[in-house]
Amino acid sequence: MPTAQINGHTMYYEIHGQGDPAICMGGWGTFCHGGERNLARGLTDRYSVLLIDYRGIGESDDDLSVAPSMTLFADDVIGLLDHLGWTNVHFIGLVGMGACISQRVAIARPDLVRSMVNMGAWARCDDFLRDQLEMFGTVHRDSGFEAFQKFVTVMSFLPEYYNENKNKLLGPNGGWKELNGHYEAHARFIEACINHDVWDELQHVQCPTLVIHAGQDLVTSPRTTEPLERLIPGAEGVTMEDVAHVVAGKDQKIRFCNILLPWLEQH
C-alpha cells in the first residue's frame, strides 16, 4: 500500500475511483483500510478520491517532538498533494478535523483547492466546544477507550439511530476504532482542534465553498458552522435539519449525496 515521506513522517494514503481529483477527510479516524465504503455513494464513480491516515493513526507514523496543530496536518496534506503532482482538487471535509484542515489548505495554497465542502466544522473554538473536546480526551485517558467510544457515539448520532444500531456502533469494529490504544494520537488531535483559529483568515479563501449545517449536531452545531458561511467570501450554506454530528442511515445518506454531488459538478 502506498506511503510517502511527507513533512517529517511516513504518510499512508489510498486513491479510489477515476476522474477529477478530490480528497475526503473526516474527523478522528480514517476512510482508508475499507473505510471507503463510508464515502458518499457515487463519489468514486466520478472522481479520483484521495484518502489519508492522519499522522499517528493507521499506517502513518508521527514525530512526537513536533507540536500538533491544524497547520501541521494541513502541511501534511499539502506535501502529499505536491508529491502526487495534484492541483485544483475538490476538498471534502467532514465531521470536524478534516474540514478544519481543508480551511488551512485553502488559505495557504489556493492553487491546490478547486472547491471546498465543510461540515461539522468551526472557525475557532468557543468555551463550549473547547470543553467538549477536552472532555472527550479526559474520558479516554481516565476511563479508557470503551468509555470514550460510548460517550462520543451518543453525542454523534440521533437517539433513534443509536438505539437501532448500538451493536455495530460500539466495540472493536465500531466508530473511532483507530483511536483504540492510541490515546497519545487522540490527545494530539484534540490539541490541534482546540487551537484551530482561522476567524480572521477565512476572508482570504478564494475557492467556491459549501457549508453544510447539521441541525441536530450536539458537537458542531449551526452555532459553529454558520460563522463559516458568513466569513468565507461567496460561501453557500445548506441546512440538514434532522442530521446529527454524523450523517447516518439510508435516507440521510441519500439526501447528503443529493446535496454534495450536484454541487461538486457545478464547480
List PLM regions with ranges.
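Conserved HGGG/HGGXW glycine-rich cap/lid loop of the alpha/beta-hydrolase fold
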Residues: Q5-D62
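Acidic beta-to-alpha connecting loop that harbors the catalytic carboxylate
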Residues: W28, G215-D217, D242-A244
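Flexible "cap/lid" loop of the alpha/beta hydrolase fold
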Residues: Q103-I107, V113-S143
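Short beta-strand/loop motif that positions the catalytic acidic residue
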Residues: V205, V211-H213, D217
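Catalytic active-site module of serine/aspartate enzymes centered on a nucleophile-bearing elbow/loop
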Residues: A235-H267
